[in-house]
C-alpha cells in the first residue's frame, strides 16, 4: 500500500472516529439532557460539567482526547510523515466538530486536538494540561483557557520536539477559528464562566 493511500485511509478513519460524540453518548447512558440542546448547546466536556457534574465530564474528556490520540499515534507508528499526521489529527477534530453520526452538530474540538498532540510526548501533554487547568482556574473561562493554550501549543512543541511544530500549529489554528464566536463574546464581556452543576441538598 502506498504512503498516499495509507494516509487517505487514516484520514477517513480519523474522521469517523472523531464523529463518535462522547458527550451525547455519556449523557444518554447517564440519563442526562442532550448537551446539544442544554446549557451552552456545545457537546463537549465543559458543557457536560455544567449539566451533569464532574464524573460525567471526566468521561467525556477522556474519550474525546482518545479520539484524537488513537488515530494520530497509530499513523505515527505506521511511519506517516509529520504533515500528514497533522492532516489526520485535523480530520479527527473535524469529525468531532461535524460528526456524520450526529447530524453534523458537534463540539469545539479542543479535547480531541489536545489528545492528538499528547502522543508527541508526556512533557508536551503535561504542559498543555497544566496550562489549560491553570488558565481555567484563574479566569473561569473554558474558552479563554483553550484559546491561550492553543496559542502556546506550537511554542511548547518547538521547544520540546520541533519536528511536529507545523502539525500542532495547524491544530491550534483550527481551535482558534472554531472559537471565533467565543472571542467576540469575551471582548464584549458576554462569555459564560464555567460552573459545576449544583446537586440538590438532602432534606
From Swiss-Prot:
UniProt-listed SMART domains: G3P_acyltransf (SM01207)
Subcellular location, record wording: Cell inner membrane
Main location group: membrane
InterPro entries: G3P_acylTferase_PlsY
This protein's record includes keyword Cell membrane: yes
Lineage top rank: taxon: Bacteria
A GO CC term assigned to this protein in UniProt: plasma membrane
Swiss-Prot/TrEMBL GO biological process terms: phospholipid biosynthetic process
EC number in record: 2.3.1.275
Coiled-coil boundaries: none
Pathway field: Lipid metabolism; phospholipid metabolism
UniProt entry tagged with the keyword Lipid biosynthesis: yes
Alphabetic keyword roster: Cell inner membrane, Cell membrane, Lipid biosynthesis, Lipid metabolism, Membrane, Phospholipid biosynthesis, Phospholipid metabolism, Transferase, Transmembrane, Transmembrane helix
GO molecular function, one term: acyl-phosphate glycerol-3-phosphate acyltransferase activity
Pfam families membership: G3P_acyltransf
Reactions catalysed according to its record: an acyl phosphate + sn-glycerol 3-phosphate = a 1-acyl-sn-glycero-3-phosphate + phosphate
Transmembrane feature ranges: 6-26, 82-102, 118-138, 141-161
Membrane topology: Multi-pass membrane protein
HAMAP family in alphabetical order: PlsY
Assembly behavior: Probably interacts with PlsX.
Role description: Catalyzes the transfer of an acyl group from acyl-phosphate (acyl-PO(4)) to glycerol-3-phosphate (G3P) to form lysophosphatidic acid (LPA). This enzyme utilizes acyl-phosphate as fatty acyl donor, but not acyl-CoA or acyl-ACP.
Family statement drawn from the similarity comment of this UniProt entry: Belongs to the PlsY family.
The protein, known as: Glycerol-3-phosphate acyltransferase
Source organism (scientific name): Shewanella sp. (strain W3-18-1)
Amino acid at each position: 500500500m502506498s504512503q498516499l493511500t495509507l494516509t487517505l485511509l487514516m484520514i477517513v478513519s480519523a474522521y469517523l472516529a472523531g464523529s463518535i460524540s462522547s458527550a451525547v453518548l455519556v449523557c444518554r447512558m447517564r440519563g442526562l439532557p442532550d448537551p446539544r440542546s442544554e446549557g451552552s448547546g456545545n457537546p463537549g466536556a465543559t458543557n457536560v460539567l455544567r449539566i451533569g457534574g464532574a464524573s460525567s465530564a471526566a468521561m467525556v474528556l477522556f474519550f474525546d482526547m482518545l479520539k484524537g490520540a488513537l488515530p494520530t499515534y497509530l499513523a505515527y507508528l505506521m511511519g506517516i510523515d509529520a504533515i500528514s499526521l497533522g492532516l489526520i489529527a485535523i480530520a479527527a477534530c473535524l469529525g468531532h466538530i461535524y460528526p456524520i453520526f450526529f447530524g453534523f452538530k458537534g463540539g469545539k474540538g479542543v479535547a480531541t486536538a489536545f489528545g492528538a498532540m499528547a502522543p508527541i510526548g508526556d512533557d508536551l501533554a503535561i504542559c498543555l494540561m497544566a496550562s489549560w487547568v491553570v488558565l481555567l482556574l484563574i479566569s473561569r473561562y473554558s474558552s479563554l483557557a483553550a484559546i491561550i493554550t492553543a496559542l502556546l501549543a506550537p511554542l511548547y512543541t518547538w521547544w520540546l520536539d520541533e519536528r511536529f511544530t507545523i502539525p500542532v500549529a495547524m491544530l491550534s489554528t483550527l481551535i482558534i477559528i472554531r472559537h471565533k464566536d467565543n472571542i467576540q463574546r469575551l471582548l464584549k464581556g458576554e462569555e459564560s464562566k464555567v460552573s459545576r452543576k449544583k446537586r440538590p441538598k438532602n432534606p
